[in-house]
A protein has these predicted regions:
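Extracellular/mature segments of secreted proteins
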Residues: 24-29, 52-54, 68-74, 78-81, ...
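Catalytic and binding regions of secreted/periplasmic enzymes and modules that target cell-wall glycans
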Residues: 10, 37, 48, 55, ...
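Export/targeting segments at the very N-terminus of extracytoplasmic proteins
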Residues: 1-46
Length: 135
């Protein structure tokens, strides 16, 4: 057998992350192998993850700590990414259409909404919405 065909025990045992979400990914018809890794990179498989994007040279120190609704109103916050696949708050109209509520709410923290919006984006743009990661 050629050396290149040999798979080490470590490689053979490598599992796709975010196993607890695989059924939901399948239900939303998202490719499990790709989106499990994206989900791990973006949120570490945590449905309630929020990532803040700040303006220019500003960062979290320019904002008071506290609840989501207070932090999102901080002058330093440009946008935020929410949920398992870190959907950006700029997708407000789309989120309202698919999930019935604004990105200014916590709707994208619900896995069913987050994955439904991700499915729409994936069907139209492929993996491009997740290609860049500034964090």
């Amino acid at each position: 057998m050629p050396v290149s065909a040999v798979v080490s025990p470590v490689q053979a045992h490598k599992t796709v992350p975010c196993h607890k979400w695989h059924a939901e990914l399948k239900r939303h018809k998202l490719p499990v192998d790709e989106f499990s890794w994206i989900m791990y990179r973006e949120s570490k498989c945590v449905a309630k993850a929020v990532g803040w994007n700040y303006r220019g040279d500003l960062d979290h120190t320019a904002c008071p700590s506290g609840a989501f609704h207070r932090h999102r109103q901080c002058h330093a916050v440009k946008s935020w990414d929410m949920g398992l696949l870190q959907i950006n708050s700029g997708h407000n109209t789309l989120t309202k259409h698919i999930c019935g509520a604004s990105t200014r709410s916590r709707i994208l923290l619900q896995p069913s909404c987050n994955l439904a919006v991700a499915k729409y984006l994936y069907d139209r743009y492929g993996l491009a919405p997740w290609a860049g990661n500034s964090n």
